[in-house]
Amino acid sequence: MKTRGIRNQSWWSGRVFLLGVLVVIAGEWGLTVEGSQAIQLESYAEKEANLKDQARDGLFNRWTFDQQKSDEAPIGFSMLGFGEGPAADWMVKGDREAPSGANLLAVNSSCQATTCYRLIVANGFQYEYPDVSVRMRFPLDAAAGVGGVVFGVRDATHFYAVVVNLAAKTLDISRVVDGKELRLAQAPILPKATPWHTLRIQRNTIISKDFIETFFDGKFVVTAEDQSLAIGQVGLLIRGQNSLHFDNLHAIPLFSQRPLSAPAAY
């Protein structure tokens, strides 16, 4: 019995020591966050509150633009601009070749700067860990087609962007914070030989790590870790001087992936 008591005491002492080490490491990590990510992150209480708010039917959305009139601006969306230059023209257009069957969302930008982002975001919906997909059709001159999706949008100077450059056959993940753009990842893509392409992004989390996964034409492309921005709007973007067509924009919350409590100390 005495030997067993000594062993139990040693076992508990080891666990207490390990817990202390993890607490110290966590504290040091919180003090050494890079300046580029020095934004106040969510507490676990805030994470849980946001999770409960995300589990709402209203966040399961699909926009086909088929119920709107042609040659009008899309209803329920706001336009934002990042970078100098004129605003983009976002317009619903009738097209029998649209994936949804009737209408599509056309955008034309005359902004010549390659760092010129023109956004359109869905009003009234806030996603923290979104799963967003959209169909995209690039112009015949693919050299002029650069665009994609945005999420975590707080305003015109705070958002994440996943951008496809069909001519260069690349996909970029970028972050804009306080108007400063940072590329988080870039990878090549293999577009299918079809007019319409599919872009999908998922923002997910594992314990304390937030990461972004991207897919193009049904294939995984690249992932990036970042947690600078939290909950925000979702939408579409066009970059530089070009035109694009969008259809079948889907957005749902990945709330089932969220942890409800702090990670265990072992």
Please tell me what each predicted stretch does.
Residues 40-83, 257-266:
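Extracellular carbohydrate-recognition regions
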Residues 41-50, 228-266:
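Ligand-recognition surfaces built from glycine- and aromatic
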Residues 108-172:
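Secretory/extracellular carbohydrate-interaction modules
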Residues 177-198:
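Short, aromatic/His-centered strand-loop micro-motif at the edge of beta-sheets
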Residues 69-106, 116:
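Extracellular glycan-recognition surfaces and repeat-rich motifs
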Residues 65, 132-134, 195-206, 212-214:
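Short tryptophan-centered beta-strand motifs in secreted/extracellular beta-sheet-rich domains
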Residues 1-12:
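N-terminal secretory signal peptides that target proteins for export/translocation
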Residues 213-235:
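Short, solvent-exposed beta-strand-to-loop segments that form ligand-recognition rims
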